[in-house]
Amino acid sequence: GTHAHTWSGDGQWISFTYNDYIMEQLSKTDSAVKDLRTIAAMMPGKVSVPDDGTMENNNGEYFSAVVARVTENPAPGTDEIDKAFDEGWIGSKGYQKADGSWQHRAIAFQGNVRNEKNETIAEVFVTDIPDDITKVSPGGHLEGTAHTRPDLPAGVVQRRITRTPEGIHGPRHWLRTTSDGALILFMAKDSKNIIQVFSVSPNGGSIKQITFNDFSIQGPLNISPDDQYVSYIADNSVFITGIQTHTSERLTSRSTDKEAPFGAVIWSNNGQALAFNRRIIKEEKPYIQIFLLKQ
């Protein structure tokens, strides 16, 4: 099935994580097959399917295809992955490639690789997506077969972006990008073993540290609409950090562990407000509430 659907910057496409039901069923009888999570996308385009009476097969307004390649047993030290997850669209209109041309649709995601020690670590990946995902390379099957998972559409290019000793770390988070597509933000450990925010270009290259806090980040990150700040929870408080200045600002006083904010800190569309969750203790019971910070 599909999970965690996200609109593209132009509001036309949708990305999501995907597990193939046929492969999941096959894995119960074939030990060589595993139920692997991957990334897929939907584009506008009517789809008609036969009605089999189960109410499981329905006509639709969007066409879907898998856009990340996963494999059961990634070879150590390679770019092969056995899980693609926690993705985000790159930029509001894609990103500019090193040659100056524009890739109009692309997704950044976390991919689980095996390092030289055969340990699983997550790295940043990018998949470039063509304007039409209804076509497949010769010999391929977009829908998959009874024994193979769906193939990628023709023109999809998957690339590994980061090559780090320990990979992505920290609380679960979806990769975020600036609206111009120039930066992908993710979390990893710094030299002091503290979870910080880092950035990298979708074209690859050097990784830059964004936050320099004395404590680890506690939840997902989000970028302000003007691309100036990243918001997150840390030290039981709401924080923002300048992406270019690296200056961090505590926006709420430090809460107790029982009443600490948690989850993602969400920007309003105009960047003038932040929304977050925090527990309030009433009669010794915790109740999750929504809070707003307004400029």
Predicted regions and their residues:
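Sequence signature of WD/YWTD-type beta-propeller architectures
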Residues: 1-295
